[in-house]
């Protein structure tokens, strides 16, 4: 009981000079919680004495943890360009500057400057998407999963959607196409087998309950060997013959030809649009190289129906997303592809990567063992699962640390690396030019005195 009486009073405790200049409201909340935990520890015989300095430090640590940004800038040295866990596609600084201007001023998000009345937010990207893809109309929601859900809910509620069994995919975060269909109200009708789906499977499955023929791009895995599938071009023709909607969930979408024969595994938006599809959707922040968004393009009358769905308001994008997406679209239209970081990384020549790696090696080899090697990496983001692309990496070895420990040390200092052949690798496919100096300084601070 005497120990309980020794617990500091909150009002007196928060007056300590260590808390000067800090938010009194937040310090009070943290102090109350800390002192309550102390009381419980005393009652459970976990504490024998009270150290007020320890309590003060606990409160200060909690305050710092709460008020420090959780999202932190990192150096991606994994080589994975569209790294799902590290924020997917990077954005161009110039685009961000323009978006900041939009965010910090009033703007015409939903205001028609010509007519002087309410406008539509999607008009800011529609013309650009029409010019870029030759679509009739377009709309954007907050990600491609939302796009899939919205399309199915708009056109297929209580109706059948025909999908090949081999395309009922699961992507990151346990996002499963069949479950999304169920949540949308659509009724899944599986056809074919895991490895083979034929034209006759589609034709035999169509009935009066059918609303849509859907194709899902197998972005994060592939079926090889004894297998076959029906092309989307053929699916479009079948749908048109039966007065049905055809829809292609492309997952990751891209506009330009990709290096290293990546087009073989990733269909081009422009190629698909040649078939004049009813609808297709794709992610904005994968190979398209923009902000997170679900981009839907297709027939004007179908997009108009999507716009009338009440769910659209729940899934709509904000002014920042639209401003950033508009900048990316302008980069495509102007053929300024170097201003799209994802494409720039993909297209950087191996000689350039090698030069950067050698430059860093020369500056760091005095305090850590390193070697420039040729290796390979992957695009990431659930795209091109079987394709590896050439890259250059700097291997790191230290006599005091095993690879796992060295990787951990780097990670705690904002460098995310990978381990290959029992060595830590810094992959220059994703290391920005501006990162090189930062890496040099970090390695020097960590290892100069321990080599």
From Swiss-Prot:
Modified residues (N6-(pyridoxal phosphate)lysine): 286
EC assignment: 2.9.1.1
Pfam families recorded: SelA
A Gene Ontology cellular-component term: cytoplasm
UniProt-listed InterPro entries: PyrdxlP-dep_Trfase, PyrdxlP-dep_Trfase_major, SelA-like, SelA_trans
GO biological-process terms attached to the record: conversion of seryl-tRNAsec to selenocys-tRNAsec; selenocysteine incorporation
EC category: transferase
This protein's UniProt keywords: Cytoplasm, Protein biosynthesis, Pyridoxal phosphate, Selenium, Transferase
Gene3D superfamilies registered for this protein in UniProt: 3.90.1150.180, Type I PLP-dependent aspartate aminotransferase-like (Major domain)
UniProt keyword tRNA-binding present: no
Catalytic activity: L-seryl-tRNA(Sec) + selenophosphate + H(+) = L-selenocysteinyl-tRNA(Sec) + phosphate
Pathway named in the protein's UniProt entry: Aminoacyl-tRNA biosynthesis; selenocysteinyl-tRNA(Sec) biosynthesis; selenocysteinyl-tRNA(Sec) from L-seryl-tRNA(Sec) (bacterial route): step 1/1
Entry function: Converts seryl-tRNA(Sec) to selenocysteinyl-tRNA(Sec) required for selenoprotein biosynthesis.
PANTHER family: L-SERYL-TRNA(SEC) SELENIUM TRANSFERASE
Similarity field: Belongs to the SelA family.
Protein name in the entry: L-seryl-tRNA(Sec) selenium transferase
Organism: Aliarcobacter butzleri (strain RM4018) (Arcobacter butzleri)
Lineage, highest ranks first: Bacteria, Pseudomonadati, Campylobacterota, Epsilonproteobacteria, Campylobacterales
Gene: selA
